[in-house]
Amino acid sequence: MLGFEKAADKYLTSWAYWMYKAFHDHTTTAAENQEGIFNPDGTLQSYKEKALSRTYIQYYQGEPLEVFFNDETSEFFARFKYDGSIEEPSVLYLNKELNYNNGYKLDITDDKGNKIEEVELEEKENYIYFKVNRDKDEILIVKITLTPF
């Protein structure tokens, strides 16, 4: 599953996990008792829950260029080309309980690593909304780095 997720990140594509519970599907590549997200006793397979709770950006205030999530450390990185004509914020999803239970550091910088000061930021539950307020015609690459404590 993790290999598929990394490939989806590399090619900036979305994905969905559809095997909710075991159906004894002979076409699956999973080993016995590994189909679905639940164990045979009905408990959640925690490693799959963590694998499926990756940090990602749902909406970009521009064009996505690159995204990476480290499954072991939960560090997240993304780059996008800023489009000042977009009035809505970018929306980042993060699972605080599974990946950032001790908190996190969010950095929003340009491609050279300089902090972008003109940012409206709002955090709600497992979402971070951020809107860059720079000149609408400015050519700007925005880098997002989320690092767990």
Language-model-derived ranges and their functions:
Residues D110-E117:
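Short, solvent-exposed loop/linker segments at beta-strand-coil boundaries, enriched for Pro/Gly
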Residues M1-E97, G103-K105, T109, D137-I141, ...:
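Aromatic-rich peripheral "rim/lid" segments of glycoside hydrolase catalytic domains that contact
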Residues E118-F149:
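Beta-strand-rich ligand-recognition modules
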